[in-house]
């Protein structure tokens, strides 16, 4: 499973070095292959191990190409989806269009989200975490069924 926030660097060629603690798992799970795409709700990228991405593709394929909202979702997620794999040094290339979309600079955050990573520009990540902590969970609104039953 992918968890934890890791401060890493984007090199001049647009590569990130995946932290060592994830490399064996990624090698065993997906032979180091993954798909990177945009997050449609946050200014970050989503990096899915290939096996997890195939599940996402199945869900996207099931959407209607005649429904404008579903078509828009397919267009954005699939249109930006880029396959890649870890090199022998455990580095992964992030496509220029994806780097531009997420406004990635040299310092980035690789954040495990169980079945995928989020890749953030470090300053944007810090601002997002600050906002999340300040906002907390809203009161006076109806929580989703998942949040009603969620506990730590």
UniProtKB/Swiss-Prot annotation:
NCBIfam families documented for this protein: division/cell wall cluster transcriptional repressor MraZ
Domain SpoVT-AbrB: 5-52, 81-124
Primary location: cytoplasm
Keyword Transmembrane helix found: no
GO biological process: negative regulation of DNA-templated transcription initiation
Record flagged with keyword Ribosomal protein: no
Identification of the protein by name: Transcriptional regulator MraZ
A single GO molecular function term of this UniProt record: DNA-binding transcription factor activity
Pfam families per record: MraZ
SUPFAM superfamilies in UniProt: AbrB/MazE/MraZ-like (SSF89447)
Xref: InterPro entries: MraZ, MraZ_C, MraZ_dom, MraZ_N, MraZ_sf, SpoVT-AbrB_dom, SpoVT-AbrB_sf
Subunit architecture: Forms oligomers.
Gene Ontology cellular component annotations, sorted alphabetically: cytoplasm; nucleoid
Domain of life per record: Bacteria
Organism annotation: Psychromonas ingrahamii (strain DSM 17664 / CCUG 51855 / 37)
Protein family (similarity comment): Belongs to the MraZ family.
UniProt cross-references to HAMAP family, sorted A to Z: MraZ
Subcellular location: Cytoplasm, Nucleoid
Keywords: Cytoplasm, DNA-binding, Repeat, Transcription, Transcription regulation
């Amino acid at each position: 499973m992918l968890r934890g926030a890791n401060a890493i660097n984007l090199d001049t060629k647009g590569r990130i070095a995946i932290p060592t603690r994830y490399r064996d798992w990624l090698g065993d799970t997906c032979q180091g292959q993954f798909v990177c795409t945009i997050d449609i709700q946050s200014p970050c990228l989503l990096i899915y191990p290939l096996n997890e991405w195939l599940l996402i593709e199945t869900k996207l394929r099931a959407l209607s190409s005649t429904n404008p909202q579903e078509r828009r979702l397919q267009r954005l997620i699939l249109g930006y989806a880029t396959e890649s794999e870890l090199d022998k040094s455990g580095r992964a290339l992030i496509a220029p269009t994806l780097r531009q979309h997420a406004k990635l600079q040299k310092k980035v955050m690789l954040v495990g989200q169980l079945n995928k990573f989020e890749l953030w520009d470090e300053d944007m990540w810090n601002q997002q975490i600050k906002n999340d902590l300040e906002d907390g969970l809203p009161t006076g609104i109806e929580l989703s069924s998942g949040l009603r039953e969620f506990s730590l």
